[in-house]
Amino acid sequence: MKEKIRSFFFILGVLFPIVCQAMVATGPNSLVFKSSSVLNSLPSKDVQSVYQDRDGYIWISTRNGLFQYDGYSITTYKSNLYCPDLLTNNNIYCVAEDAQHRLWIGTYSGLNVLDKQTGQIWKIDDPEINGIGISQILVTSDNRILFATEG
């Protein structure tokens, strides 16, 4: 009988802190995540990367274009019937911002730059990287642009 009581208190001593901690974790101070209906409307759910620029905008790189989210609405950047040459490719791997507030865009087949102040996008025309996937971009503290390529 004493053995059963001892076992009961041992189990209670082990389980009680675990149960209390679980109750605290699900209490009123728990984090709650809500999905934005605007973000649910992205044409592509296949997100490659997410980047927040110095102005607070969220840039979402997908296999179907680049999307800028300002907290309320989404602006789309991708080549289409009306702007067939806007980007080297709509499959966007990554983005990074330089000191001049330009956004460097790495795609499946090249590198683009977006001037956020004018909205102008241009392609980096370099035979060494044309047609090659730019998988990562790093802007150094002295504003050098480094990028990793595929292949």
Q: Would you name each region that the model predicts?
A:
Residues M1-G151:
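Carboxylate-rich, polar loop motifs that coordinate divalent cations or form catalytic acidic clusters
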